[in-house]
């Protein structure tokens, strides 16, 4: 089970709000955080914040991160302010990204560039149109790393024993080999073997 990195989660949220330069709705921020976690997993074969992920009726979210902004913790203590239009950086906050690596920042910036300027309604339309195929509308369930990986590649499937398999390559292509090891390296090998664009 991954360890939740609270400081990284706070700095990731701060980075996205800093890029926004204004308030972002709670739904939009939580979805952008999920997309960043997902992109980091697919690129680097490990979780960014370590938060568990859940499919909720309105969309996927990082449960540990959502708890930071739900009132169970004090967002103000971490430099965030609630407003009528969502969360923003507090005016007294000078964001620091000391806990974020260059890869972390690149992932956050990439997600912002792709989705940050979209409205909450536009993000919901993208979700309904398959932005995150591991999420199904109206379903509440845990989202595992394996489900994300399987959802992005038609070549990968899970057999009844929960082993990950790669279907045979199409005729005329080189045979792909799969080494399945637990942990991040297994996911890395699977992602490369399946030809997933990362």
Residue ranges and their predicted role:
Residues 1-198:
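Domain-edge interaction signal
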């Amino acid at each position: 089970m991954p360890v939740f990195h609270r400081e990284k989660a706070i700095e990731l949220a701060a980075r996205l709000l800093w890029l926004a330069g204004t308030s972002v709705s709670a739904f939009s921020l939580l979805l952008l955080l999920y997309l960043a976690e997902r992109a980091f997993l697919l690129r680097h074969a490990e979780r960014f914040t370590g938060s568990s992920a859940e499919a909720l009726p309105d969309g996927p979210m990082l449960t540990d991160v959502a708890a930071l902004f739900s009132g169970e913790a004090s967002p103000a203590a971490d430099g965030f302010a609630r407003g009528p239009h969502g969360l923003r950086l507090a005016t007294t906050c000078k964001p620091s990204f000391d806990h974020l690596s260059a890869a972390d920042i690149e992932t956050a910036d990439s997600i912002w560039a792709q989705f940050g300027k979209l409205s909450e309604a536009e993000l919901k339309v993208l979700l309904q149109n398959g932005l995150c195929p591991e999420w199904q509308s109206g379903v509440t369930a845990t989202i595992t790393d394996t489900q994300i990986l399987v959802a992005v590649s038609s070549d990968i499937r899970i057999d009844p024993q929960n082993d990950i398999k790669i279907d045979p390559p199409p005729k005329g292509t080189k045979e792909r080999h799969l080494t399945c090891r637990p942990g991040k390296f297994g996911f890395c090998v699977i992602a490369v073997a399946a030809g997933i664009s990362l």
